[in-house]
């Protein structure tokens, strides 16, 4: 669709209206909803560069909307929560390596053993930092591809690998709701009843260290779905990021690999994920990449968007347009 057309703007406007109707009915309208809507409208009705930014980055915006909207449907649509089967599989696979315990519980015992020490504070802060930059790092990687290196084709491959991954993950969250290890540690294998607390896991230690309730508040009150452990997006996003950073720059692979490895360790250390969750997240990443590279990009994007020139580099197109306009002014 031509992003300069009024029809495209009408679609955006109607989409925003429907979005507000939905969240008003299922949730409650928050300031961040209003901010996001105003941002989208500003870009949609802005200059050509702004509209192209919105068009290219729309997959990330739509995912955030859908993920946030899970607050209104996750509790009412889900069936039986998978609790013991995931735990038993983790114990069977990794119990012999961790003294008959699952890795996350083994690390909880380790934390208790070093409680109050400086090394525990370092581990807690490092794990919290890695865990909380989860959503920011993919956006930074996207910005590097889209703006810094101005590689629109690579950005599309990255963005739609993320999109396919997110679609697969959201579908799984609904069809296979699964409890993380912090739930088993606090509630056992019983199905959830009423309001849940403790979703921050070992991030509570960081709150206690900093004398705040930041992580407790975020995970207990702003988490859209407590039972979205499989697949682990903390396990999959870092792989997508380092895959495309290496494809683009062809250097520093050992250093890049540290990011997913440390993030996986943080997810287990904080009692938020089983190792199985992370492995499944990695498998989902491979599937998403193959679908993007073998089907979506060659059969759709190369024959539509890139052929039409929608994703031509902004600076080059803007310079050409300015030159044409200046030439017309000189002639007149």
Can you say where each PLM-predicted feature lies in the sequence?
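Short, hydrophobic transmembrane alpha-helix segments
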Residues: 19-31, 42-53
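Membrane-interfacial catalytic/cofactor-binding modules of polytopic membrane enzymes
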Residues: 175-248
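Interfacial segments of alpha-helical transmembrane regions
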Residues: 57, 139-176, 181-193
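Intramembrane catalytic core of multi-pass membrane enzymes that act on lipidic substrates
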Residues: 54-137
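Interfacial helix-loop-helix junctions of multi-pass membrane proteins
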Residues: 180-183, 229, 262-287
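N-terminal membrane topogenic signal
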Residues: 1-12
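Membrane-interfacial alpha-helical segments at the cytosolic side of multi-pass membrane proteins
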Residues: 140-147, 235-253, 283-294
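Membrane-proximal cytoplasmic C-terminal regulatory module of class A 7TM GPCRs
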Residues: 291-327
């Amino acid at each position: 669709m031509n992003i300069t057309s009024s029809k495209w703007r009408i679609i955006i406007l109607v989409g925003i209206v429907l979005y507000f109707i939905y969240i008003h009915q299922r949730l409650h309208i928050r300031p961040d909803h209003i901010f996001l809507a105003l941002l989208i409208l500003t870009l949609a009705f802005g200059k050509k560069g702004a509209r192209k930014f919105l068009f290219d980055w729309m997959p990330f915006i739509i995912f955030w909307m859908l993920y946030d909207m899970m607050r209104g449907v996750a509790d009412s649509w889900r069936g039986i929560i998978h609790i013991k089967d995931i735990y038993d599989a983790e114990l069977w696979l990794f119990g012999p390596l961790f003294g008959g315990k699952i890795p996350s519980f083994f690390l909880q015992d380790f934390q208790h053993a070093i409680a109050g020490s400086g090394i525990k504070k370092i581990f807690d802060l490092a794990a919290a930092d890695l865990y909380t930059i989860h959503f920011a790092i993919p956006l930074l990687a996207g910005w590097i591809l889209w703006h810094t290196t101005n590689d629109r084709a690579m950005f599309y491959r990255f963005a739609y690998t993320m999109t396919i991954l997110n679609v697969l993950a959201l579908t799984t969250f609904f069809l296979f709701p699964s409890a993380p290890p912090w739930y088993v540690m606090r509630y056992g294998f019983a199905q959830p009843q009423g309001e849940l607390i403790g979703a921050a896991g070992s991030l509570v230690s960081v709150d206690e260290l900093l004398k705040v309730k930041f992580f407790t508040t975020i995970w207990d009150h702003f988490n859209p779905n407590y039972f979205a452990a499989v697949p682990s997006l903390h396990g999959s996003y870092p792989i997508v990021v380092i895959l495309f950073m290496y494809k683009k720059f062809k250097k520093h692979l050992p250093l890049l690999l540290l990011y997913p490895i440390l993030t996986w360790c943080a997810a287990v250390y904080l009692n938020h994920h089983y190792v199985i969750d992370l492995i499944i997240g990695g498998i989902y990443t491979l599937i998403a990449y193959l679908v993007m590279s073998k089907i979506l990009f060659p059969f759709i994007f190369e024959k539509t968007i890139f052929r039409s020139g929608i994703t031509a580099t902004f600076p080059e197109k803007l310079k050409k347009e300015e030159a044409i306009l200046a030439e017309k002014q000189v002639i007149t």
